[in-house]
Amino acid sequence: MDQLHSLFTELLGLESPFHLGLIEKDLREGQISSMTFTIEIDKDYRPSRFHNIHSYYEKTWQHLSLFQYPSFIKARLPVFMDKRNGKTEVIEIPWARKGSGFTLLFEEQVLALLRLCNCKTTTANFFNIYPQRVQTIYDCYTKSLYEQRSPEVARKVGVDETSTKKGHDYITLFVNLENGQILDIQDGKSSDTIKNYAEELRILGKSIDTVEEFSLDMSPAFISGVKRNFSRARMTYDRFHVVRLIGRYFKPLYRSKKIDHELLDYHLKDFDQLWTQLNCENAAAFLCYWKDRTKELFKMNRLCKSINKHFMGIVNFVESKVTNGLLEGMNSKIQFIKRAARGYRYTENFKRMILFAFGAL
């Protein structure tokens, strides 16, 4: 029995003045239903020579399961009175936060599963607790961190918007493309979104010149915002959006019987050579050639004008190698978070859950 007490004392991380008392199994219909560990405090313990024991109180905390059995920690703890001022105080316990009915280790596992599955109901069902208690644990650990959090800056930044609810409500994510860390989340998707990010960095004394590369779609608002507020940063338009733009212009041509579809296929496939050019000079020369051939073969003046408008942002990929692929993957998870919660009434709660899900809180 001494060996068992010694083992569980070590597993529970108990140190003086706390020690392990009874270990009890709770039976239901002759079968073990749960385990309870009673923690006691040394009888002669006092915070100081000015303290006397005033009273006792009992409390139980749910702990991590022992094998397949739910386990609980129970303690009868003293309330001390300070003889100098007559005030009472309780002893601080190392295994749980104040006011919680769960141990710190239990709450840690709840948060780990919630971060993984992004659904409070699923997490609650797994641990056999009420969803509101999962919400309470989540709020306790994330609210203050979210309020204290400030925007970060990085060398390579990806920018992408995502919807917060049905309609036209959006938030914009700023992500470090080198490690996937969320740098900031701003409301909206206008040029002011980029401006607000830059201004917050300046207020915090963080140099906006740290940003060398921006990866973004061809949103005029984002392009304008980066040009005005991050003038030293190089812009690269996401490959996927560039290819999608070209495909959108070519799609109507496939409906025509007067145009050779094999020639269309070849010309579209030929565009992929752009991404393998050695440098921006070669890429610019190739894009000019491809654009001129497009105009000559298919009379696509509007596409050529669009390429001219976004020319450098397209060819910059050859050297920057940055894309928004990481953000597109994150966006899929973000939309799952929104669906799992059946929407968020308040945008700040949605932003907090995103930061939590991606490890930024």
State each model region's role.
Residues Y138, K166-H168, N176-G180, D187, ...:
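Acidic/histidine-rich catalytic cores and adjacent linkers
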Residues M1-I93:
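Short, conserved DNA-binding cores of transcription-related domains
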Residues R248-K257:
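Short, surface-exposed amphipathic charged segments that create phosphate/polyanion-binding patches used
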Residues T60-H168, I208-D209:
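Short, positively charged, Gly/Tyr-enriched micro-motifs
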Residues I91-P94, L177-L183:
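Gly-rich Lys/Arg/Thr-decorated short loops/hinges at beta-loop-alpha junctions or inter-strand turns
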